[in-house]
């Protein structure tokens, strides 16, 4: 008799509500100290996340679906086989509007140029964050549409 798949609950929540809720065999994300992967029965963890991609493997074998979600910072908590990501912003790859993401990238690049010309450090920092968010959304969209 085959061993039952070891799946756990993965939830992604933003200030706008629940964005994602499924069972999976692993969740991978970028934490502030590097890339992380959580599997069934992982030790409890609470760690901050950076702008990056969250990948959820929906089943134990490589042929199972992988969901891609763009997140813009937040935290992940894992305990009792439940992973909860509380993100500043999150968007599933299937919901990303590529033209809007590319337009946001162009706007951010223009703001970076403007901030450098004006020597405005605050504007530069905000524009660099906006650029990282836009590039992340484009990357996550591309991961789904390979």
Curated annotation (Swiss-Prot):
Belongs to the ATPase epsilon chain family. It is a peripheral membrane protein. CDD domains: F1-ATPase_delta. HAMAP family: ATP_synth_epsil_bac. The lineage of its organism: Bacteria, Bacillati, Bacillota, Bacilli, Lactobacillales. Keywords: ATP synthesis, Cell membrane, CF(1), Hydrogen ion transport, Ion transport, Membrane, Transport. InterPro entries: ATP_F1_dsu/esu_C_sf, ATP_synth_F1_dsu/esu, ATP_synth_F1_dsu/esu_N, ATP_synth_F1_esu_C, ATPsynth_dsu/esu_N. F-type ATPases have 2 components, CF(1) - the catalytic core - and CF(0) - the membrane proton channel. CF(1) has five subunits: alpha(3), beta(3), gamma(1), delta(1), epsilon(1). CF(0) has three main subunits: a, b and c. It comes from the Bacteria. Produces ATP from ADP in the presence of a proton gradient across the membrane. One of its GO terms (cellular component) is plasma membrane. GO terms for molecular function: ATP binding; proton-transporting ATP synthase activity, rotational mechanism. It is found in: Cell membrane. This is ATP synthase epsilon chain. It holds the Pfam family ATP-synt_DE.
């Amino acid at each position: 008799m085959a061993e039952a798949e070891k799946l756990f609950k993965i939830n992604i929540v933003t200030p706008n509500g629940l964005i994602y809720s499924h069972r999976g065999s692993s969740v991978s994300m970028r934490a502030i100290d590097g890339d992380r992967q959580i599997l069934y029965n992982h030790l409890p963890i609470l760690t901050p996340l950076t702008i990056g991609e969250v990948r959820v493997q929906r089943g134990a074998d490589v042929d199972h679906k992988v969901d891609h979600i763009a997140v813009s910072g937040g935290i992940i908590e894992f305990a009792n086989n439940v992973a909860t990501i509380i993100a500043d912003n999150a968007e599933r790859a299937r919901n990303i509007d590529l033209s809007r993401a590319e337009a946001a990238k162009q706007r951010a690049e223009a703001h970076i140029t403007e901030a450098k010309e004006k020597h405005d450090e605050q504007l530069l920092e905000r524009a660099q964050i906006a650029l990282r968010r836009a590039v992340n959304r484009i990357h996550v969209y591309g991961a789904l549409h390979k």
